[in-house]
């Protein structure tokens, strides 16, 4: 997750660490957790649940930020996507239990939620989402495959059981009645991510006839997203359609929307590509799966929880 690397550079925080021989000692772990102002849990789901249970009932000070999927739709935990809604940042600031979002979910929700809230995207829409991620998203086992020097795939799709672990939060926080059909893939690059959602105007959107007649749907979608993220520090809506491609740093070789252009940042970019004649649209979100999709989001939530500039230590 790169959380320690990001926090080690800070001079406003004191990091608490257990000696190697105490890291499986429950009493030592409990003491460290209860001594911390903020604890970030970078653990598998079951271990994160166990760690959260170590907080003493009388401890009303320690803030937990859980990077696992264990608590993301738990009503007793606050979803750690500050840009989710106008009041989400305040909810995070007031919470002692913050669930860090999943990387894929961050991109999908960033695209869908504003359009649902604006009354443009039907909550009943049966969406499809596809995504490509760097192999670091698979943790040490997958990193070992790609970096071990042996043969490996240049690209690989997965989750063909159609039950990816991010689906519950994708449905819940996009305010959809059903989760999308989600088709993720891993590429032969370490970091970076693009999440794409295609839309059919008449099937998925609630549009006034005059918008369809005038061919103004793309502008309407773009305006809704721009309004939602106005003033956001880390989320930006790029110029509409192919105009975004004219910015040389965004599209290399004139043809590719690269997933790795935001690596080592906490930024997320949104693109809107529509064909008014065909009445179709593709929304795309680009982010670093280890940045806004993981450690960057955790640090942003930590900053909000501590009441300091949410961008401290982030790019």
Where are the model-predicted features located?
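Short alpha-helical basic/polar micro-motif
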Residues: 96, 113, 219, 296-297
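Active-site catalytic microenvironments for nucleophilic, acid-base chemistry
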Residues: 114-118, 200, 301-308
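N-terminal Rossmann-like NAD(P) cofactor-binding subdomain of oxidoreductases
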Residues: 1-153, 158-160, 273-276, 311-314
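C-terminal substrate-binding/catalytic lobe of Rossmann-fold NAD(P)-dependent oxidoreductases
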Residues: 3-30, 42, 123-131, 135-283
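PAPS/PAP-binding and catalytic site of the sulfotransferase fold
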Residues: 98, 197, 298
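NAD(P)-dependent Rossmann-like dehydrogenase/reductase catalytic/cofactor-binding core
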Residues: 267-315
């Amino acid at each position: 997750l790169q959380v320690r690397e990001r926090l080690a550079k800070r001079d406003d925080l004191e990091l608490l660490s257990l000696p190697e021989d105490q890291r499986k000692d429950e009493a030592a772990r409990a003491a460290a957790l209860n001594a911390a102002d903020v604890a970030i849990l970078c653990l598998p789901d079951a271990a994160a649940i166990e760690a959260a249970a170590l907080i003493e009932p009388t401890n009303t000070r320690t803030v937990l930020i859980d990077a696992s999927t264990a608590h993301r739709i738990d009503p007793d935990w606050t979803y750690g996507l500050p840009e989710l809604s106008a009041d989400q940042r305040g909810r995070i600031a007031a919470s002692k239990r913050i669930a860090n979002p999943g990387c894929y979910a961050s991109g999908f929700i960033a695209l869908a939620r504003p359009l649902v809230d604006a009354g443009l995207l039907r909550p009943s829409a049966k969406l499809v989402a596809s995504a490509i991620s760097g192999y670091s998203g698979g943790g040490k086992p997958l990193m070992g495959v790609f970096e071990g020097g042996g043969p490996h795939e240049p690209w690989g799709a997965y989750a063909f059981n159609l039950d990816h672990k991010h689906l519950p939060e994708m449905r819940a926080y996009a305010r959809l009645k059903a989760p999308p059909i989600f088709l993720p893939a891993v590429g032969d690059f370490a970091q970076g991510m693009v999440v794409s959602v295609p839309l059919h105007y008449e099937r998925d959107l609630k549009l006034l006839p005059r918008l369809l007649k005038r061919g103004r749907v793309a502008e309407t979608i773009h305006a809704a997203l721009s309004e939602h993220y106005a003033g956001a520090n880390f989320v930006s809506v790029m110029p509409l359609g192919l105009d975004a491609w004219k910015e040389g740093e965004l599209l290399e070789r004139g043809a590719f929307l690269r997933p790795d252009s935001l690596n080592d940042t906490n930024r997320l970019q949104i693109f809107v590509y529509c064909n008014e004649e065909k009445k179709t649209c593709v929304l795309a979100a680009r982010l670093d799966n280890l940045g806004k999709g993981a450690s960057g989001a955790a640090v942003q939530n930590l900053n909000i929880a501590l009441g300091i500039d949410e961008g401290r230590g982030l790019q």
